[in-house]
Amino acid sequence: MAALNEFVSVVVSDGSRDAGLAMLLVSRPPTNALSRQVYREVIAAADELGRRDDVAAVILFGGHEIFSAGDDMPELRTLRGAEAETAARVRRDAIDAVAAIPKPTVAAITGYALGAGLTLALAADWRISGDNVKFGATEILAGLVPGGDALARLTRVAGASKAKELVFSGRFFDAEEALALGLIDEMVAPDDVYDAAAAWARRFLDGPRHALAAAKAGVDAVFELPRAERLAAGQRRYVEVFSAGQGGDAGADPHGG
């Protein structure tokens, strides 16, 4: 079943094997350039996926040819003043919306993941890439800096020194280097990308959903909240999980006794 906007769609499997598996599909040929409209549609799709009870895990996909070549540069060049601020905000909100989906998310990366396209991939929990994919934090080549919290996400994974080198140079790098840097979690043949991402996501379809959501929020909070707020939020999620009846097997001793 699909809910279709112009460029972004939500597709939820109704098959018995993959019941609960959904796809957030960006389709704006030929490069999946990310315009303000695309970002708004991503926000709406991410919100829908987060709310739907029939969705347990999500694959972020740009199709079999390309993930995304980044921001719509012709559109960006026309923006001035308040319009530029709005564009920056909607980009950040879209990246944050994907990162905040309270379910396991896997980016299936094909072709190119450049600039904001790389940032969008980094918003997923895991990334599966074809062995021929080219990556790049390429904004500097257009006289820009990465937006949408890209610098923090890239630094979190690759470290400050490597993040600076990639951002300052804007150079392309291949999937093998991305794997070595931890930017992707698995590298497969180009034709196997979606299936590999589905296999990764499939492991979580039968998991305790409230607990998975709480665990994801807790890990993300390590990077986003001060310690006192993080501990308070963690305690609140712990109680909420048990209140929802998702506290695990009542007959099991959590301490192994």
Swiss-Prot record:
GO terms for biological process: fatty acid beta-oxidation. Keywords: Fatty acid metabolism, Lipid metabolism, Lyase. GO terms for molecular function: enoyl-CoA hydratase activity. InterPro entries: ClpP/crotonase-like_dom_sf, Enoyl-CoA_hydra/iso, Enoyl-CoA_hydra_C. It catalyses: a (3S)-3-hydroxyacyl-CoA = a (2E)-enoyl-CoA + H2O; a 4-saturated-(3S)-3-hydroxyacyl-CoA = a (3E)-enoyl-CoA + H2O. Its EC number is 4.2.1.17. The record marks E139 as: Important for catalytic activity. Belongs to the enoyl-CoA hydratase/isomerase family. Could possibly oxidize fatty acids using specific components. This is Probable enoyl-CoA hydratase echA17. The gene is echA17.
